[in-house]
């Protein structure tokens, strides 16, 4: 981790685009970002409806790359710290990892399928929930940093064109 600045972006695609442009050649580390977060972020950057993308991924259980070829226009190098069993491809969720690492599990009282705009209090609670998830993702990453370094080392061994 070379950059340690927190960015809280709420309903501001221009600010998200500026963050993406400033970091687009970097490695984006996350928990399940390969299958979820990158598609939500790319969709917002492309002016798509993130709720429709979310439902495609979660409700319909479809792959993000199937939603739109336009996602390919936005390069994003992802490193996903979500562990999976190589034989069964079953994944381990972040809350399970938090238990394994001895962390407190934080949940939110804000209903994810709410049909109205969030109140200011609900937004603050959601930011707190997301911040905790990011902190736990960093903790998982630091536990697996040797794996990241090995993968990064292999990639660096190949010449760039």
Model regions and ranges:
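Acidic, Mg2+-coordinating catalytic module of metal-dependent nucleases/exonucleases
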Residues: 29, 84-161
């Amino acid at each position: 981790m070379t950059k340690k600045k927190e960015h809280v972006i709420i309903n501001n695609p221009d600010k998200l685009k500026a963050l993406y442009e400033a970091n687009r050649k970097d490695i984006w580390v996350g928990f399940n970002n390969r299958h979820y977060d990158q598609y939500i972020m790319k969709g917002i950057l492309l002016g798509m409806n993130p709720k429709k993308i979310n439902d495609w991924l979660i409700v319909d259980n479809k792959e993000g790359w199937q939603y739109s070829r336009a996602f390919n226009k936005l390069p994003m190098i992802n490193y996903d710290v979500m562990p999976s069993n190589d034989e069964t491809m079953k994944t381990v969720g972040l809350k399970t990892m938090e238990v394994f690492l001895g962390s407190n599990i934080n949940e939110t009282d804000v209903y994810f399928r709410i049909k109205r705009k969030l109140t200011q209090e609900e937004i603050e609670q959601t930011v707190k929930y997301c911040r905790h998830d990011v902190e736990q993702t960093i903790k998982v990453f630091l536990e697996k940093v040797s794996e990241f370094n090995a993968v990064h080392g292999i990639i660096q061994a190949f010449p760039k064109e």
